[in-house]
């Protein structure tokens, strides 16, 4: 059960209750108000981090570091991904999955008997794609104006993902970090840091290779 506490505080409490060791934990700052029944500890923490992402537009990754829990924002790893350091790659771009250019949040003000609407939109992409609306009801209007802006920042991007196959390995690369990508795909030049969503390391006959799943929205420099 989690109520009115930041993800950082939640992780510390779970660690204390289950006798887990904590390393350095980033301060997520945003107090999450929710109750999770019949959920795993991982799901409880992930739900809290997801709410923090939607409210503040910040990604946090929780992982084990030498027996201690570590929570941090995306960090840069000194690893360059190019057409010469990888065997092959697959590229996908879509606006069909979790892409929105208009955010609408509704709060039912029972005292006044009205529904308050909070909106944010990107007119440029509405003209380009038509209206792709995200709608949700919220329990509190506190921070609603900031939340719609954060959600627009998260979702108003074409979903661009790249799968890199058999690139030179680096044990410092793990999910949640950022690697520098320099590729030309379908005439579009990518030269930016991208988020590692998933990594698989392979060690064979003294050779270290890895497969990566990367994402980066419109390959902006916000990281």
Regions found by a protein language model. Name each.
Residues 57-156, 160-204, 218-220:
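Acidic, small/polar-enriched beta strand-loop surface segments
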Residues 1-94:
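Charged- and aromatic-enriched interaction segments used to assemble
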Residues 1-24, 179-190, 200-222:
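N-terminal targeting/assembly segments of extracytoplasmic apparatus and virion spike/baseplate proteins
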């Amino acid at each position: 059960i989690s109520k009115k506490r930041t993800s950082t505080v939640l992780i510390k409490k779970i660690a204390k209750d289950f006798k887990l060791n904590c390393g350095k934990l980033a301060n997520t700052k945003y107090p999450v108000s929710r109750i999770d029944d019949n959920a795993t500890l991982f799901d409880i923490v992930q739900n809290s981090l997801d709410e923090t992402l939607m409210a503040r537009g910040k990604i946090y990754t929780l992982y084990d570091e030498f027996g201690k829990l570590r929570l941090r924002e995306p960090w840069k790893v000194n690893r360059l991904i190019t057409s010469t350091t990888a065997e092959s790659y697959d590229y996908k771009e879509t606006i069909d999955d979790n892409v929105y250019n208009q955010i609408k949040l509704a709060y039912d003000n029972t005292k006044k008997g009205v529904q308050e609407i909070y909106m944010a939109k990107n007119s440029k992409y509405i003209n380009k794609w038509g209206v792709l609306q995200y709608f949700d009801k919220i329990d509190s209007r506190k921070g609603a104006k900031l939340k719609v802006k954060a959600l627009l920042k998260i979702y108003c991007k074409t979903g661009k993902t790249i799968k890199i196959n058999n690139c030179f390995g680096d044990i410092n690369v793990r999910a949640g970090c950022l690697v520098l990508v320099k590729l030309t795909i379908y005439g579009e030049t990518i030269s930016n840091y991208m988020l590692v969503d998933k990594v698989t390391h392979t060690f064979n006959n003294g050779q270290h290779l890895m497969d990566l799943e990367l994402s980066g929205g419109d390959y902006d420099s916000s990281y």
